[in-house]
């Protein structure tokens, strides 16, 4: 598994994870993507989901399983994950764009309307990403949830952004 060797998933490896929705479900609208492959004692995502779309099961070290049909894409589970392994992807944002929501703990935080570098799992720039929303509720313990729009072909690839420094 490339996660252990390189620190990030190969896109093909994601298909075997129980928290990744099918391509058919991705086409229906916003849905959670859980990129968790570590069997460690952890279950905040399960309790954060009011729809019961995420299940850990009897053993707290089980990988989270997604029932994508129950998921509304609300994103309450994103900041609940201490491993920052949960995202919400909407492949139907527009005809040509998808949105990606992800946890963000860097400063300075981007602002709505900013154009940032859309980064893949390896931290490489793959596209421009427009910041649509920045949410920082107190219950998220200072973890912001950022929503960006990206070209549709990068919806399942972009997992973070890099702010572009502006010359002032």
What does each model-identified segment do?
Residues 85, 120-125:
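Short, charged beta-turn/beta-strand-edge "cap" motif at the junction between a beta-strand
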Residues 124-138:
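Short beta-strand-centered aromatic/proline hotspots
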Residues 109-111:
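Short, well-ordered loop/turn sites that connect or cap secondary structure elements
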Residues 19-41, 54-73, 90-105:
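Ferredoxin-like iron-sulfur electron-transfer modules
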Residues 136-150:
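Short, solvent-exposed secondary-structure boundary/capping segments
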């Amino acid at each position: 598994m490339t996660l252990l060797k390189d620190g990030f998933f190969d896109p093909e490896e994601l298909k075997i994870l129980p928290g990744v929705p099918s391509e058919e479900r991705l086409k229906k609208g916003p849905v959670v993507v859980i990129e968790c492959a570590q069997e460690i004692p952890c279950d905040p995502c399960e309790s954060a989901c009011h729809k019961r779309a995420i299940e850990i099961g009897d053993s707290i070290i089980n990988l989270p399983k997604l029932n994508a049909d129950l998921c509304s894409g609300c994103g309450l589970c994103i900041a609940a994950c201490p491993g920052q392994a949960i995202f919400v992807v909407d492949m139907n944002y527009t005809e040509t764009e998808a949105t990606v929501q992800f946890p963000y703990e860097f400063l300075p935080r981007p602002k709505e309307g900013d154009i940032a570098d859309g980064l893949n799992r390896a931290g490489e720039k793959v596209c421009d990403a427009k910041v649509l929303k920045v949410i920082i509720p107190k219950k998220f313990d200072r973890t912001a949830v950022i929503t960006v729009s990206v070209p549709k072909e990068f919806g399942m690839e972009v997992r973070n952004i890099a702010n572009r420094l502006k010359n002032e």
